[in-house]
A protein has these predicted regions:
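Hydrophobic ligand-binding cavity/cleft-lining segments
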Residues: 1-47, 51, 156-157
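Intrinsic-disorder/low-complexity, polar/charged segments enriched in Ser/Thr/Lys/Arg/Asp/Glu/Gln
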Residues: 2-6, 43-45, 58-60, 73, ...
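Hydrophobic/aromatic beta-strand elements that line small-molecule binding cavities or substrate pockets
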Residues: 5-7, 34, 60-67, 78, ...
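Short strand-connecting beta-turns/loops that link adjacent beta-strands
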Residues: 12, 41, 70-71, 98-101
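N-terminal, polar/charged subdomain of small-to-medium soluble alpha/beta proteins
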Residues: 21-24, 63, 145
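A conserved amphipathic terminal alpha-helix motif
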Residues: 115-156
Length: 157
């Protein structure tokens, strides 16, 4: 299953990169995330509650950020299991300044596999569900960026 697209986030490239790789921001913005604990630099243990087409469960696994080239890109690897199934995926995140540099274009390209009960749902339902989760994540991250900018502006006054 492939997921790709791009989104524009509020903030300069370095600030967006820092937020997208901040464990607390990731924990807050991953839908259903109950745990996102760093176990080694760039590697996190996760617990998420999720569901697609009536199949609900708890996902436990790891998320690894690698190949970091701040502030341009990094690779995100996800591996985990849930209710007799598994999820594996790799995604590339690329960032580029947009316009006057006050916004950043984030491009993502990922490929994932699911097995077990969730695989029976099929691509027809998985693709839109994945896109919805990605959109929720980036809306939340844009909110994080705006909050951080507001806090920074208040601290500077």
């Amino acid at each position: 299953m492939k997921v790709d697209g791009n989104v524009t986030l509020s903030g300069p490239q370095q600030a967006v990169y820092d937020t997208l790789s901040d464990p607390e921001a990731l924990r807050q913005c991953l839908p259903g995330c109950e745990k996102f604990d760093e176990v080694s630099p760039g590697r996190y243990e996760t617990v998420l509650k999720a569901g697609v087409a009536g199949i609900k469960g708890t996902f436990t696994g790891t998320v690894t950020l690698s190949d970091a080239k701040s502030p341009e890109s990094y690779t995100l690897t996800v591996e985990g299991s849930f209710s007799g199934g598994f999820v594996k995926g790799v995604g590339n995140i690329s960032l580029a300044p947009e316009g006057d540099g006050s916004k950043t274009k984030v491009s993502y390209l990922g490929d994932g596999q699911v097995g077990g009960p969730l695989a029976s749902v099929g691509q027809r339902l998985m693709a839109p569900a994945s896109k919805m989760v990605v959109n929720q994540f980036f809306r939340c991250m844009d909110g994080q960026m705006k909050s951080r900018q507001s806090a920074g502006a208040q601290a500077g006054s």
